[in-house]
Amino acid sequence: MATETTTATPTAPSATTAEITPLPAFSPDLYQRAWASIPHPSLPLIATCHAHSVTVFSLSTLSKHSVLTGGHTRSVRSAAWQPPRGKVSGKEAKRLRLVTGSFDTTAGVWTWDQGRREESLEREIRLQSGENDQEAEEEEEAEDEWELTLVLEGHENEVKSVNYSPSGQYLATCSRDKSVWIWEDVGNPNPSSEEEDEEEEDEDEWETVAVLQEHDGDVKAVAWCPDVPGRKGKYAPPRRYGDDVLASASYDNTVRLWREDGDGEWVCVAVLEGHEGTVWGVAWEGRPRENDKFPRLLSWGADEVIRVWSLKEPEEEEHGEGAAGGGGNNTWGFGVPNTMRRSLKEEWECTAVLPKVHKGDIYSVAWSTETGLLSSVGSDGVLALYQETANTTEKNEENETNGEAPTTTSAGGWKVLTTVKGAHGPYEINHITWCKRYDAGSERKGEEEMLVTTGDDGVVRPWQVRIQ
């Protein structure tokens, strides 16, 4: 269930100025439509989907690192890095895996080949640490050393999006066939030692645990809620189901939220309605909220609107021992039949609609985990930057006079800081993401953030963002 309000939570003082400037593009240009660029969660690598391939670029050198090719017969639309599972150490690279979603109806699981992976990735780690390693800089890029180790089949039409849960245990895929599939990694669960990891690192075994078919149209995107304190904190829903929550966006103009109930069944717990066109994507808030409130959710689409959704805070009594299944009469816990449990439905509300900037479909929005800034791109070629602010209304007439989008604040407390028109020339921009900087021009390698846009022109372009 979803309702719409215009409440806002005051935030830190607003920035007065913002500047977005282009950095040298990743090389080489791809010279064909590119769909998305996905940064690795911890290594200085970013994977770009295009044609039948994925090109992995180095964030240290802004050049090609490796290529995944030969596994798909149609365009690769999406990709996701598997988060490290079990013990995390300097040998984390041994479990480097990427999943790709393709228009050929399949998802592919790729592993970096052991023969060259350690040498190449250790080079990236040296560059990441800021060492002035001239020899590393001059090394030739590695040959294509990716191996397609598993193909996930089941969808009847194009796979539009793939996304891992925070633990890496689950993978979600969605398709034009109106379904969302959830897969579980059962090949190497929670390795407890480096020796065990060494023995099992090449095992890839996935099982289908759910096929969700409640959307009435093409499912465009899926996104798992990140593992931030609010996901399990005071304002998290009572334990009538597991911690993982998945959001899906659809051609049917809705967003659906999914959770695993006490019987291990994945169920729809909320339908978010309000968009007047296809919902192209969803993104979760990655920064912890004040008082450990549950993470908010973004949605955007063909109606040129970006919405912010918040979980309605439950009544205090719902957090009692009975609701949590931890004692008392266990009235609503896991130990009673489905028919006797309280409804699994959650109530979400639209707490903000961002100021309108785009004239055309909004294809991608990114939410910074460091600053909380939002950035958006779409079919009009505009790159926009937003900031959350106090619940006031402002308008910067100077921006409007200069032909820029006027700086305004919506009822929900967001304003436009700046825009870049024609960020990829006349071409549509399909994707935007925040990621860490490791290149030579960075003043704080591994800490400073930049934006990366991916467009129909085949250019993967980084952008420096300066806020004052």
From Swiss-Prot:
Compositionally biased intervals (Acidic residues): 193-204
WD repeat copies, ranges: 71-122, 154-193, 214-268, 274-319, 357-396, 423-468
InterPro entries given in the database record: CIAO1/Cia1, WD40/YVTN_repeat-like_dom_sf, WD40_repeat_dom_sf, WD40_rpt
Pfam families: WD40
GO biological process: iron-sulfur cluster assembly
Keyword line: Repeat, WD repeat
HAMAP family linked to this entry: ciao1 (MF_03037)
Function of the molecule: Essential component of the cytosolic iron-sulfur (Fe/S) protein assembly machinery. Required for the maturation of extramitochondrial Fe/S proteins.
Family, per entry: Belongs to the WD repeat CIA1 family.
Protein name in UniProt: Probable cytosolic iron-sulfur protein assembly protein 1
Source species of the chain: Neurospora crassa (strain ATCC 24698 / 74-OR23-1A / CBS 708.71 / DSM 1257 / FGSC 987)
Gene behind this protein: cia1
